[in-house]
């Protein structure tokens, strides 16, 4: 489940001059902080498409031999359109229920890695929960890219406890599936 910290969300600055065109493509979820209600699937991939006007997202993972996926819309967050900061909104429809997720890109080189972050304040608990994802254009972080990501995580250690990351599995066995299932669409809830 979520990891809670006392008080409000900390003040965080996403990357400046965010380039959605360069960010587009398939990203492998190398690791993530535990997140309540998120899949525990393997072989998790987020694919961002952008044609210069409209953007979309296709998230997929494999669980028990089934490739489950969600399709949604993607746009730069309203407060980031003019500041050019790396904040975007993903909108998924599960039947009548609409879910908006707002990841912030803390760091990326657009070609090899990205570190996404999100914080939610929970007034009932007077606490916030932090979510973070390490993304890569390849199935593993190696060499210089791994070193860069480790160093970036050190600079954000006041926000993200890297020891809490859960690694994803991109082995051939974990990624095998025999059927697909859409989590989004008019008949899903």
Curated annotation (Swiss-Prot):
A GO biological-process term: lipid metabolic process
Pfam families, alphabetized: Lipocalin
GO molecular function: pigment binding
Xref: InterPro entries: Calycin, Invtbrt_color, Lipocalin_ApoD, Lipocalin_CS, Lipocln_cytosolic_FA-bd_dom
Keywords noted in UniProt: Bile pigment, Chromophore, Disulfide bond, Pigment, Secreted
GO CC, any one term: cytoplasm
Tissue: Synthesized only in the caterpillars, apparently by the epidermis and secreted into the hemolymph. The protein is passed over from the larval hemolymph to that of pupae and adults and is sequestered in the eggs.
Disulfide-linked positions: 9-119, 43-175
Keyword Lipid metabolism in record: no
Gene3D superfamilies per UniProt: 2.40.128.20
Location relative to the cell: Secreted
Chief location of this protein within or outside the cell: secreted
Domain notes: The molecule consist primarily of eight antiparallel beta-pleated strands, which enclose a hydrophobic pocket, and an alpha-helix.
Assembly and binders: Homotetramer.
Function: This protein binds a chromophore: biliverdin IX, isomer gamma. Mixed with lipoprotein-bound carotenes, this blue protein provides hornworms with their green cryptic coloration which serves a camouflage.
UniProt family annotation: Belongs to the calycin superfamily. Lipocalin family.
PANTHER family: APOLIPOPROTEIN D (PTHR10612:SF34)
Name of this protein: Insecticyanin-A
Species of provenance: Manduca sexta (Tobacco hawkmoth)
């Amino acid at each position: 489940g979520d990891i809670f910290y006392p008080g409000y969300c900390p003040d965080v600055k996403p990357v400046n001059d965010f380039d959605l065109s360069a960010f587009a493509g398939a990203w492998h979820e190398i690791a993530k902080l535990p997140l309540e209600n998120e899949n525990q699937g393997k072989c998790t991939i987020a694919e961002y498409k952008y044609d210069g006007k409209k953007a979309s997202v296709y998230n997929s993972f494999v669980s028990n031999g089934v490739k489950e996926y969600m399709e949604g819309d993607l746009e730069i967050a309203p407060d980031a359109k003019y500041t050019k900061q790396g904040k975007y909104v993903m909108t998924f429809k599960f039947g009548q229920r609409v879910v908006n997720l707002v990841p912030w890109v803390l760091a990326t080189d657009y070609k090899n890695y990205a570190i996404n972050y999100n914080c939610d304040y929970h007034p009932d608990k007077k606490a916030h929960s932090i979510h973070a994802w390490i993304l890569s254009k390849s199935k593993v972080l190696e060499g210089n890219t791994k070193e860069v990501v480790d160093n970036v995580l050190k600079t954000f250690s006041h926000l993200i406890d890297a020891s809490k990351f859960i690694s994803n599995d991109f082995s051939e066995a974990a990624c095998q599936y025999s059927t697909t299932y859409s989590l989004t669409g008019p008949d899903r809830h």
